[in-house]
Design a protein with these regions (language model features):
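Conserved NTP-binding/hydrolysis module of P-loop NTPases
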Residues: 8-13, 72, 82-101
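Conserved AAA+ ATPase "SRH/arginine-finger" region at the nucleotide-binding site
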Residues: 77-81, 171, 184-197
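Short regulatory helix/loop adjacent to the ATP-binding pocket of P-loop NTPases
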Residues: 64-67, 167-182, 191
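Walker A/P-loop nucleotide-binding motif
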Residues: 41-63, 80
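Trafficking entry modules
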Residues: 2-13, 18, 23, 256-304
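Mid-core helix/loop region of P-loop NTP-binding domains shared across ATPases and GTPases
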Residues: 83-84, 99-142, 151-154, 193-197, ...
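Sensor-1/coupling segment of RecA-like P-loop NTPase cores
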Residues: 47-52, 58, 106-110, 134-139, ...
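C-terminal helical "lid" subdomain and adjoining coupling/linker elements of P-loop NTPases
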Residues: 20, 152, 210-283
Length: 304
């Protein structure tokens, strides 16, 4: 639609999580380094949280891609509205195990045997659970019990829980106090500040084939308005920017004005609120891996 008019080779503001378009802020690099470190060092439980649309699923897809082709076998559970049995069946199937018709005890036995064989070969096994804030207390407790699968010196299964901020509240509950005690690393994705919002928009335009001239599609005052309405949430930045380009294209305009952003925000019924501010926590060793993870992200982008 507007891609030809603005000489782009693809839509720069798709809301589908695509590692090719990852704009890695300092916080994103630190969070990814912390997750990767936790898995590599067999820490057991790692948690990633953030508000809706801040890029959690995209970051996890980058983690899965970084682990792909290595000694790390991964199961990715993204349907969190499952019973305990369904969850175990889903995880076992994603690990390549036969789960059809098996009851809970049989599934646990299969998983334990699978993990022990991999451990004996000095291989790492990771389970990523997305949308974990929707998990029932019963399923979360079952996940905790999976970390009982261990040797005398380390956990056999590395678990990454990913969810909205409500996940942290759920993990603070009395019923899940034992699970909370087993969490060794936490990372939180903050919304973007103005400078990162500007860098995010420019990066996506460039990756979509924008020339230096086309990169001026969004003047600073326009980006400031996008940041104002989006509150720095990448998903909203994409939605606003995409709609703004459609409007600008319809009017055959060379750039997006502040007025267009106001129109789009009004049509989308976007209000302004304060986002929750939480610091990212990571270990020192996790921070040491930030540079190497950043280099890996560049290599990852070239795969797409």
């Amino acid at each position: 639609m507007y891609t030809d008019f603005y000489k782009l080779n693809r839509n720069p503001f798709e809301i589908t999580p695509d590692p090719y378009f990852l704009y890695a802020t300092k916080e994103h690099k630190e969070a990814l380094a912390a997750l990767y470190y936790g898995v590599r060092q067999h820490k057991g439980f790692v948690v990633l949280t953030g508000e809706v649309g801040t890029g959690k699923t995209l970051l996890i897809r980058c983690l899965l891609q970084l682990c792909k082709g290595s000694d790390i076998a991964s199961a990715y559970v993204f349907n969190s509205r499952l019973s305990t049995l369904e969850f175990l069946q889903y995880a076992a199937t994603d690990f390549g195990l036969s789960a059809t018709g098996k009851h809970k005890g049989e599934l646990l036995h299969e998983l334990n045997r699978f993990l022990l064989v991999r451990h004996q070969k000095q291989l790492t096994t990771m389970m990523v659970v997305d949308e974990a804030h929707h998990l029932s207390t019963e399923v979360l407790e079952e996940i905790r019990l999976l970390t009982n699968l261990e040797t005398a010196d380390e956990k056999l299964l590395q678990i990454v829980l990913v969810g909205q901020s409500e996940l942290s509240d759920k993990l603070d509950s009395h019923e899940l106090r034992q699970l909370k005690q087993r969490i060794t690393l936490r990372a939180y994705l903050e919304p973007l500040d103005f400078e990162d919002t500007k860098g995010y928009i420019q990066c996506r335009l460039q990756l979509a084939g924008a020339s230096s001239g086309t990169a001026c599609l969004f003047p600073d005052e326009t980006i400031a308005r996008i940041h104002h309405f989006s509150r720095g949430i990448p998903r909203l930045i994409n939605t606003i920017s995409d709609n703004a380009l459609i409007t600008a294209f319809a009017r055959q305009l060379a750039s997006v004005s502040v007025g267009i952003i106001d129109e789009v925000a009004d049509e989308l019924r976007l209000g302004v609120g304060r986002s929750r501010s939480v610091c990212v926590f990571q270990t020192t060793k996790g921070a040491d891996q930030t540079l190497s993870v950043g280099q890996s992200l560049l290599q990852l982008r070239h795969q797409y």
